[in-house]
UniProtKB/Swiss-Prot annotation:
Name of the protein in question: Protein cornichon homolog 4
Subunit structure: Interacts with Sec23/24 complex components SEC24B and SEC24D. Interacts with CCR5. Interacts with ADRB2 in the early secretory pathway.
Species this chain originates from: Bos taurus
Family of the protein in this entry: Belongs to the cornichon family.
Keyword annotations: Endoplasmic reticulum, ER-Golgi transport, Membrane, Protein transport, Transmembrane, Transmembrane helix, Transport
Bilayer topology: Multi-pass membrane protein
């Protein structure tokens, strides 16, 4: 059963890595003016909820399967994703708003956040891979 938990977490983490890379590519396209702010934000806002659900699902799964260290490692990122989604002002298009993305260095902060998430998901990927191999060997 433990191996199934880590296989699912590994697959989910792969999806989150690809999503982080997509965020970085789309934000860098906006930074270089290859796409306009409205299309960039609509592309990115489509994937905010799937990212939130995917990461929260793994966090809850680690809590249920009693992997406390991994749960506590994932909890701040899941809480940040939930906080970021809840705190969107009512007039905005979503987490990524085309009217504000160029203001106050928001583009740079979104890019930095995407890079940090990519590093975090890569760390989690190798941690889940190691845990999955260990669980398969122990079974």
């Amino acid at each position: 059963m433990e191996a199934v938990v880590f296989v699912f977490s590994l697959l989910d983490c792969c999806a989150l890595i690809f999503l982080s890379v997509y965020f970085i590519i789309t934000l860098s396209d906006l930074e270089c003016d290859y796409i306009n702010a409205r299309s960039c934000c609509s592309k990115l806002n489509k994937w905010v909820i799937p990212e939130l659900v995917g990461h929260t699902l793994v966090t809850v799964l680690m809590l249920i399967s009693l992997h406390w260290f991994i749960f506590l490692l994932n909890l701040p990122v899941a809480a940040w994703n939930i906080y970021r989604y809840i705190m969107v002002p009512s007039g905005n298009m979503g987490v990524f708003d085309p009217t504000e993305i160029h203001n106050r260095g928001q583009l740079k902060s979104h890019m930095k956040e995407a890079m940090i998430k990519l590093g975090f998901h890569l760390l989690c990927f190798f941690m889940y891979l190691y845990s999955m191999i260990l669980a398969l060997i122990n079974d």
